[in-house]
Amino acid sequence: MAVVTMRELLDAGVHFGHQTRRWNPKMRRFIFTDRNGIYIIDLQQTLTYIDEAYEFVKETVAHGGNILFVGTKKQAQEAVANEAERVGMPYVNHRWLGGMLTNFQTVSKRLARMKELQAMDAAEDGYQGRTKKEILLLNREREKLERVLGGIADMTKVPSAMWVVDTNKEHIAVSEAKKLGIPVVAILDTNCDPDEVQYPVPGNDDAIRSANLLTSIISSAVEEGRKARAERQAAAAKDAAGDTGKSEADAEAVKAEAAAEEKAETTEA
């Protein structure tokens, strides 16, 4: 079964690119034509690239990897948060902090601070002995950290790969991923640079419906990958149990054989 149909892509407006005066010549090969000063993306190619991206994400997750969802522009914020949360993956949908990947050790300290403030807020006597002004400042600090880091609260290491909506807006995130050798899967509009990503998905990164559809496809790939991982783990556990049972049976056979030999020796004596 196809990951997505041509009709679904058309209905979501994935084929609409930018105005012809706003483009990156490197995207020429992904453009079908232009109409009324707007580039039209070749959706036949998009379908092929979606399949490649889907398979990559699925296999990455199946082998224990995690995918960081990134989309801070207004049109992508809701889709990125909803789809990432649906499949239990980290996400950034408000502001990318410089060094979020390349200086993850420092980010981890800020995550620890956020959790400390959350625990303080949840405890009945968490603010005991503090003034109203101090409590107000602590709450503001917590809310600010939650806004920026809430989506990666459970991320304990840099991601295995990254899904990005609008590589131009998220150029810092893409640059950090490149420095660390983290593969990037991304929507590439007609003003983007395809050389910046490993798994391009030519499409409209400005329309809400397009961002929703393409991000949901990636989250579905994550879902399939998690199922495949669970199946592999179950099969491995079954094999291990079988080997254990076999070993125990072999041990019993050896013991029985030794007992028989001992009995025979006693009889002969």
From Swiss-Prot:
Q: Where is the composition biased (Basic and acidic residues)?
A: 245-269
Q: Which UniProt keywords apply?
A: Ribonucleoprotein, Ribosomal protein
GO terms in the biological process aspect are: translation
CDD domains to which the protein is assigned, alphabetical: RPS2 (cd01425)
State one molecular function term (GO).
structural constituent of ribosome
Question: Which domain of life does the UniProt lineage start with?
Answer: Bacteria
Biased-composition ranges, Low complexity, are 233-244
- Gene Ontology cellular component annotations, sorted alphabetically: cytosolic small ribosomal subunit
- Cited SUPFAM superfamilies: Ribosomal protein S2
Extract the ranges annotated as region (Disordered). 228-269
Q: Which InterPro entries match?
A: Ribosomal_uS2, Ribosomal_uS2_bac/mit/plastid, Ribosomal_uS2_CS, Ribosomal_uS2_flav_dom_sf
The record, for NCBIfam families, names:
rpsB_bact
Query: What is stated as this protein's family in its record?
Result: Belongs to the universal ribosomal protein uS2 family.
Provide the protein name.
Small ribosomal subunit protein uS2
